[in-house]
C-alpha cells in the first residue's frame, strides 16, 4: 500500500526510512507554492523527484508575504500567460484545496469606485475579464455594494463572485505533503551552490552533497535569475518589489467579509492598497508598492503604515475603531525595472535554449498563487513533450485535513 505522510509544517530532511538517493529524474529548485505545485503535479508520474529549498522551511519567501487571494483573472492583461494561467488556475486551486484539506473560502470580491468618474475604468476591467474568461463579473451600484459589504463606501463596484481567500503557506505545505506521500523527496536548508552540465543532465552541488538529475525546474522566485545563472543562463534580471501590510485585530472581521480593492491604475502595474479578510478573522491592509535594492529587504515603515490606514479608511471607515496588531512586508519578483524601461512583463515558463532539460519559471508574481497549479501543468507538458512519462495508477490525490490545535476542544488540547 502507498504510504502517506502527514506534516503540519515543512521538513528539513527527507521523509523516508531509506537513504536519500543521489540520482533523480527531476530536481525542483525552490519550495514556494509554485515549486511545491510542480513537485505535486510531477508526482502523478513515475518519476524520481527531489525538491531543494535554501531556507529552513518551505514557503519562506514570496509564498508567505502575500494577500492570500484566489484571483479570478480580470486584473491581468488579455492574451498574456498571466491571464491564461490565472483563469485556468482558478478552478484548479479550489479543487486542490478541497482534495488536500486546505482552509479556503469563496468570498467574492469588490473593486470599488468611490467617485462616479471611475466607472469607465470598472467597465474596462469587466471587458478585460470577459475576454480572459473570468466568470460572473458584474458592475453593481451602491445598494448592491451595501448588500455584499455593508461597511464599504462606494458609488459603483465590479463584483467578482468567484474570487476567494486561502492560506498560502498551508496550501504550499499541503502540496508538498501530497508529493511526499507519493514518493518525492524534499530537502530544506539546502541551497543550490553549483551546477555542472552533463550529457545526460546536471550535477547539482549543495552543502549536503551532489545530486544528479536529468531535468531541473527552476522555481526559485526572487532568486530565479541567480539560479539560472549558476547554469550559465544569463537571460533574466529580477527586481525586488516590496509590499508592506498591516494586520487588523480579529474583531475587524465583523465589518469586512469580502476582499475590497480600489480602482487600479490603467497600466496594471499595481492593484492598489486593498483590504482582505483572512480565514482567521483578521483584515489585511496592503500591500504598498516600492522597488528595493536588496532582495531580502522586508522592512516596514511608519510612513507607509500611516498611508495604508488612510487609504483603507477611505473605503471602509468602520475600520478606524479596531486596533492594528502587526505589520509585515512581502517581496515580489518583478521583471519590469525601476527606471520604467520595461513597461510590461509576463510570466516566463520555458525550457532553456542553452541548457536542454532545464526549465525556468521566472517573474512569477501576482497572480502566481492562483496560477501555480496551471504553471505546474505546463511544466509537466514540457517534460512530457520530450520524453515518455506515464501516469501512476497508485497516485494518491487526496490528503486528510491536518487537525489544528485552535480548532480542538479542551480535551483535545490537553
PLM regions with names:
Residues 68-144, 148, 154, 270-273:
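Dinucleotide-binding Rossmann-like beta1-alpha1 core, especially the glycine-rich loop
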Residues 78-88, 112-121, 159-177, 187, ...:
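Short beta-strand to alpha-helix junction loop
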Residues 43-65:
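Glycine-rich FAD pyrophosphate-binding loop
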Residues 158-215:
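Helical element adjacent to the flavin cofactor pocket in flavoenzyme catalytic cores
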Residues 37, 195-286, 291-299, 310, ...:
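Flavin-dependent oxidoreductases
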Residues 270, 279-280, 291, 295-408:
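C-terminal catalytic lobe of FAD-dependent flavoproteins
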Residues 24-51:
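N-terminal Rossmann-like FAD-binding beta1-loop-alpha1 element of flavoenzymes
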Residues 1-26, 44:
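Extreme N-terminal leader/targeting segments of oxidoreductases
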Amino acid at each position: 500500500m502507498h504510504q502517506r505522510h502527514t506534516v503540519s509544517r515543512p521538513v528539513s530532511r527527507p521523509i523516508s526510512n531509506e537513504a536519500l538517493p543521489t540520482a533523480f529524474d527531476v530536481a525542483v529548485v525552490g519550495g514556494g507554492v509554485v515549486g511545491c505545485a510542480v513537485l505535486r503535479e510531477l508526482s502523478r508520474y513515475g518519476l524520481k523527484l527531489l525538491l531543494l529549498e535554501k531556507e529552513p522551511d518551505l514557503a519562506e519567501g514570496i509564498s508567505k508575504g502575500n494577500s492570500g487571494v484566489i484571483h479570478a483573472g480580470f486584473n491581468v492583461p488579455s492574451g498574456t500567460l498571466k491571464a491564461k494561467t490565472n483563469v485556468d488556475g482558478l478552478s484548479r486551486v479550489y479543487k486542490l484545496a478541497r482534495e488536500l484539506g486546505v482552509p479556503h473560502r469563496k468570498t467574492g470580491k469588490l473593486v470599488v469606485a468611490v467617485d462616479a468618474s471611475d466607472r469607465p475604468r470598472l467597465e474596462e476591467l469587466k471587458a478585460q475579464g470577459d475576454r480572459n474568461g473570468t466568470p460572473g463579473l458584474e458592475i453593481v451600484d451602491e445598494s448592491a455594494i451595501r448588500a455584499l459589504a455593508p461597511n464599504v463606501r462606494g458609488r459603483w463596484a465590479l463584483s467578482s463572485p468567484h474570487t476567494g481567500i486561502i492560506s498560502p503557506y498551508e496550501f504550499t505545505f499541503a502540496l508538498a505533503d501530497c508529493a511526499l506521500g507519493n514518493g518525492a523527496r524534499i530537502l530544506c536548508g539546502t541551497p543550490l551552490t553549483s551546477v555542472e552540465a552533463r550529457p545526460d543532465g546536471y550535477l547539482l552541488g549543495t552543502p549536503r552533497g551532489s545530486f544528479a538529475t536529468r531535468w531541473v525546474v527552476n522555481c526559485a522566485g526572487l532568486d530565479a535569475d541567480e539560479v539560472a545563472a549558476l547554469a550559465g543562463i544569463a537571460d533574466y534580471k529580477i527586481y525586488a518589489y516590496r509590499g508592506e501590510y498591516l494586520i487588523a485585530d480579529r474583531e475587524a472581521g465583523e465589518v469586512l467579509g469580502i476582499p475590497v480593492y480600489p480602482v487600479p491604475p490603467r497600466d496594471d502595474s499595481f492593484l492598489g492598497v486593498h483590504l482582505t479578510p483572512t480565514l482567521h478573522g483578521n483584515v489585511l491592509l496592503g500591500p504598498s508598492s516600492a522597488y528595493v535594492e536588496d532582495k531580502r529587504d522586508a522592512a516596514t515603515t511608519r510612513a507607509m503604515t500611516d498611508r495604508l490606514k488612510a487609504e483603507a479608511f477611505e473605503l471602509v471607515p468602520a475600520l478606524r475603531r479596531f486596533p492594528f496588531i502587526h505589520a509585515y512586508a512581502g517581496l515580489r519578483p518583478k521583471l519590469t525595472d525601476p527606471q520604467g524601461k520595461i513597461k510590461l512583463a509576463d510570466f516566463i515558463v520555458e525550457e532553456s535554449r542553452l541548457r536542454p532539460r532545464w526549465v525556468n519559471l521566472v517573474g512569477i508574481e501576482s497572480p502566481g498563487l492562483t496560477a501555480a497549479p496551471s504553471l505546474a501543468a505546463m511544466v509537466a507538458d514540457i517534460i512530457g513533450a520530450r520524453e515518455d512519462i506515464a501516469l501512476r495508477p497508485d497516485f494518491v490525490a487526496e490528503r486528510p485535513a491536518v487537525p489544528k490545535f485552535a480548532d480542538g476542544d479542551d480535551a483535545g488540547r490537553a
